[in-house]
Amino acid sequence: MQLIDLVKNAKEATYKLQSLNTDIKNNALLEIAKKIEENKDKIFEANKKDLEYAQKLLDENKISKSMFNRLKLDENKLIDVVSGIRDVVKLEDPINKVLLETELDDNLLLKKISCPIGLIAVIFEARPDVISQISSLCIKSSNAVILKGGSEGENTNKAIYNIIEETLNNIKEFPKNSVNLVFTREDIKELLSMDKYIDLIIPRGGNSLVQYIKSNTNIPVLGHADGICHLYIDESADQEKALKICLDSKAQYPSACNAVETILVNKNIASEYLPKLYNLFKENEIKMNADAEVKKILTSSDIGEVKEWHFEYGDKEVSLKIVSDTEEAYNHINKYGSHHTDSIISENKDNIEKFMTFVDSANVYCNASTRFSDGFRYGFGAEVGISTNKTHARGPVGLEGLTIYKYKIFGNYQIVDDYVNHRASFKHKRIK
């Protein structure tokens, strides 16, 4: 099938998907989760092939270590995948919810109703779990989806997609082409030109992929280009607890977009705290880069130079900087960060309030690891990605982020001319 025909069919499916009731969608998701569990050995075998191919690409410096790590799909990740699908089942159906209701006049009722976005294209790199996450959210929100994964994960993507496609094909109410997978690099360029049919593009990958998509399409793009996340260790912080958060934020999953990349330390505790942090990171094989002020305290030769503050390592590497106060911390974050996730570690309520007010990011925390910015951890069931946009959806984007709304008026043969010429007047009585 030609790509244009697939896209047209998927667009046609969007209209039929809106009529599916919640039970049909939930039963489909439960069946997909069950089939993924039953076929996990096939999925792991496919992932093994991808990892062998990816290892060659890594050896040739064609992909990064962080991309290689994201490609791995083990037992724990698959448990999370299946749990994520089942959690989506538990969530309230976001479609056809009355968001606002106003009585404009007698027998003239305005309602704001949630509805699907339509046809969504998701382009991703080395994230085989994306297929099940995105598909489950699109099914529950009655959107059709076209998925395009990287060649490095092709076998795993096919294995998971085939399970989803077969399951949906066995449910008579589901229209064909509700969930689609395309493969070639040429497909990306063609998809980006199809603004007549595709309503939203979601890129899941590195900076170069996201920037390429944003620069080459007229279709709205939802996502983030970088994950340059910060921790600020305030002078009032509980230092031992702060160390645990620093380690978790960097080492728990270094290649994640919500892993910390820069740690800012208040000058009043720097001489005491930085040596503790150095010893902890050294023990956990985390490379540290620092500015001149930090190097006056940490004099070891293994401390590297910070070449650029706006930089995402995506590995067991981090930048360290001393700041004078909370204001300097949030100014640095707003200048060099990516508006993704930033956290203050502090016992001072005023400093916490300042930080959480003035840091211009989608996720802002106090006394918590940056790794919490995730749809599953937020209770969204799964996520299509993290958005740093300031329109439509921001932060981890779950079901609600895949809906928009329409205004419906229920009238009784009213005409505007009566209101313009004062033969009738509006009540504008808010009901909901």
From Swiss-Prot:
GO cellular component terms given for this protein: cytoplasm
Keywords associated with the record: Amino-acid biosynthesis, Cytoplasm, NADP, Oxidoreductase, Proline biosynthesis
Position of the signal peptide: none
Name of the top EC class for this enzyme: oxidoreductase
Coarse class of the protein's main subcellular location: cytoplasm
Keyword Oxidoreductase: yes
Subcellular location: Cytoplasm
Enzyme Commission code: 1.2.1.41
Gene3D superfamilies in the record: Aldehyde Dehydrogenase, Chain A, domain 1 (3.40.605.10), Aldehyde Dehydrogenase, Chain A, domain 2 (3.40.309.10)
Pathway: Amino-acid biosynthesis; L-proline biosynthesis; L-glutamate 5-semialdehyde from L-glutamate: step 2/2
PANTHER family: DELTA-1-PYRROLINE-5-CARBOXYLATE SYNTHASE, GLUTAMATE SEMIALDEHYDE DEHYDROGENASE
Entry function: Catalyzes the NADPH-dependent reduction of L-glutamate 5-phosphate into L-glutamate 5-semialdehyde and phosphate. The product spontaneously undergoes cyclization to form 1-pyrroline-5-carboxylate.
Designated name of the protein: Gamma-glutamyl phosphate reductase
Gene: proA
